[in-house]
Amino acid sequence: MKNHNVEVLAPAGSYDIMKAVINAGADAVYLGGDMFGARAYAGNLNKEEMIRALDYAHLRDKKIYLTVNTLLKENECTHELVDYIAPFYEAGLDACIVQDMGVFKILHSAFPDMHMHASTQMTITGEKGASILKEMGAMRIVTARELTLDEIRQIHEKCDIEIESFVHGALCYCYSGQCLLSSMNGTRSGNRGRCAQACRLDYSVVNNDKVINDSKSSYPLSPKDMCALDILPDIIDAGVYSMKIEGRMKNVTYAAGVTSIYRKYTDMYLENGRKGYHVSQEDKNMLLDIFNRGSFTSGYYNSEKGKNMMSLSRPNHMGVKALQVVKNDNGRILFKALTDINPQDVFEIDSDNAYTSGDSYKKGSTFTVNLSRKLPLYKDRIIYRMKNGSVTKEIAEKYASQAGTLKKPVNMLFTAECGKPMKLELEACNTKVSVFGAYAEIAGKQPATVESCIKNLSKLGNTDFTAGKITADIGTNVFVPVSILNDLRRKGIEKLTETILDKYRRQTVDESVYNVCKASSKDISVTVNDSIHDGKYSTSVYLKTKGQLKSYILSGLNNDNVYADFKLFDDDECRKNIKKLADSQNVTAALPYIITQSQNRIFGSLIENIRSCNIEMFLVRNLEEIGFLGNLGQKTGFVPKIVTDAGLYCWNSFSVLQLRDIILVCGCELTRITLPYELNYKEMNMVNYGVPTEFVAEGFVPVMISKQCVRKTYGLCDHNNGIIYLNNKRSGTYMVESVCSFCHSVMYSAKRIDVGYDSSLLEEINPDYIRKDYDNMHNETAWTGHYDVGVE
């Protein structure tokens, strides 16, 4: 074993669930407050509950991490953000989990001694991105769920930063932080904590104009949940410090039940090693009962992507096989129990009807129930249990009740000697305190005994402590009133509690912390060349295919900038044409949306091909690419010029500042940034970018970047780039492109953005560059995106 210091990190959507997961064995809990969290529809905690949660956790030597993992608009990066965090910081908040680079900059500047965790929404896929975040001040990264064990191991070995990775729960189809599917179907943005779960809808899969799926496989974007119990030792040995359980939207049964299982097996491995590590089928069955989407996978750690990772027939809880219909006599149903049945088990009959068990039945036994004759309960039909009454009851009693409350043992020493003040010393959580009472007097009739004093001191009731080792040193013939003993115990516990919490608490925030909110975009203008914009727009055109490249060259068009998609550089003829084009026009190489740790060699070859065409400007889509180009530039002496794409979010001035600093530190030059798809023109105008901007005025929006591939899921993988379509009756038809060289797929919006060069929106946004796809497609589904409306 390489890593003996690990953390079980549990989710909580409410104060009560927070208590339950700590009682169930969590070392730390991540939860959201009432602002800026990526689960806007979870219960979340208000200010008072959050401070109570911090105290509850700290008295038990546990940690609380606050999610501030949404993108913030310019008008939100104000005193309001600092005001929101300040009371939690003062109360000892252990860390903030952050997505927005601007929020990261503000909070790290305002509260430098508070740990910052880089959210999985930052799409961290390799050690270069991890190193950048460490340089920014991150104490921990939450890796993308898509990384393999070997990729995580390499990050651990090459970058000295804490690693947090998911081990259980729902998997997003898209790389977290790169999904615009919900947003582009309405106004609910996943980047604002309001994901509408469009990935869990049904779609027809269309290949060569033919629908190739049916009702049994109509959820092509819905992955099964992950359960990493079987490979937990491998995950720990790969360097994962914090094992994260997904589920801030889940109930207490899920959160506490799953936490208890991962506590059990983490301890089993740390105490007994691999030889003593064995996962029982009973515990796996319990997890399936709690929630599953048709069995589990171990995620991307060691699973091959494709059909086996997907829940194609159903996107929600599938339950477990529990009953078989033996006979239906006009509504009198004879069931056979396929597993042990408990009181309050709930069984799904159809979407509108369920049956709740009133008794216990052993596996293999039969029993009769009277149900509506209209229900589709035909012979041999299998009925699934959706709720296990026994598991629900057990978890509630163990972890969600007062009896299940985790308490720290407190040791006490009581001293009473005639003529001296009575004294009570208490010790817990590496903290010692003493309190004093009245002077001890000689007993008139009944002197105090050691046993009676210990008995009274042990009565800790509903405090946060339980009696540990309690001793009493009492002189001869000493009188100790019970009232004084009770008062000493009460004062002692109060003092001990406050002393423990004082170790976590910080000084009141000084007014100077608000100065960070005044930095704004004026600081950008000082350190980045001002945009020279005279009201005329420079034009960029995006060439994706070999045919488009040939057509563009033959057209004789001359744009201010030409984007050549990275796939073009794999072709000898394309490289020759691009090199020739670069002699007369500015050509920028558009890099892949995602590169992972294991793809460095392939990416290096791509950059060599690009550089052979005399190109030094790159459209980058992630931090890993910035780090790679920076390292390459330092080795070879050239300074890569960078255009950031929309997925490197710049929603506010501070994110621009942070991104600029990253690029400069990496030894690159920030040429311009691409404006976000999800801000409207008013919100964009609030940001003084201080660097040339580019606006995507025409084209399909990449709404999902996924390690999965629809073509592979449906048995069409030929290891060649290809196109397939998904159709949803409500939202339209989406094109999904397989990108085989970097093993991911890109799903594009059903509706095409087409603002038009004469649009009043362009005048309102006033960008330096406008970008369009070179495909000349104009269709009835074109719209202006969120540039006019925005997102919630």
Where are these regions (language model features)?
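Active-site pocket-lining/capping segments in soluble small-molecule metabolic enzymes
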Residues: 2-124, 142-242, 249-792
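Short, conserved phosphate-binding/catalytic loop or strand-edge motifs used
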Residues: 128
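Long, basic N-terminal domains or extensions that often function
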Residues: 139
